[in-house]
From Swiss-Prot:
UniProt organism field: Chelativorans sp. (strain BNC1)
Function: This is one of the proteins that bind and probably mediate the attachment of the 5S RNA into the large ribosomal subunit, where it forms part of the central protuberance.
GO cellular component: cytosolic large ribosomal subunit
NCBIfam families: L18_bact (TIGR00060)
Protein known as: Large ribosomal subunit protein uL18
One GO biological process term: translation
């Protein structure tokens, strides 16, 4: 089992590299729980959330069988891309946090790219 310390370190390494690479772009942050997936576009300079989507949104809850599969992640990815575009954002930096770029995280990223976000 992975300890909380190693998960926190891994997330910190990822975020430190992101801040070094892209300071002017907002960050597309992903959180994955055992039952749902969440995504938000964050402006780190101001500390504001510009757009957010999750498998808990009322529109999606009725459509999705579960919030914990690859299909749900794809729908959330399309929704976050749509909301970010509406907020005037088209270029972001993808923050996978401590999660491996595989499965639900990859599905969300691919759907966000298809939706028009560039990262």
């Amino acid at each position: 089992m992975v300890s909380k310390v190693s998960v926190t370190r891994r997330a910190g390494r990822v975020r430190r590299k992101l801040k070094a690479v892209a300071t002017e772009r907002p960050r597309l942050s992903v959180y994955r729980s055992s039952k749902h997936i969440y995504a938000q576009v964050i402006d780190d300079v101001k500390g504001h959330t510009l757009a957010a989507a999750s498998s808990l949104d009322k529109d999606l809850r009725e459509k999705l069988k579960t919030g914990a599969d690859v299909d749900a992640a794809g729908v959330v990815g399309k929704l976050i891309a749509e909301r970010a575009k509406k907020a005037g954002i088209d270029k972001v930096v993808f923050d996978r946090g401590p999660y491996i770029y595989h499965g639900r995280v990859k599905a969300l990223a691919d759907a966000a790219r298809e939706g028009g976000l560039e990262f």
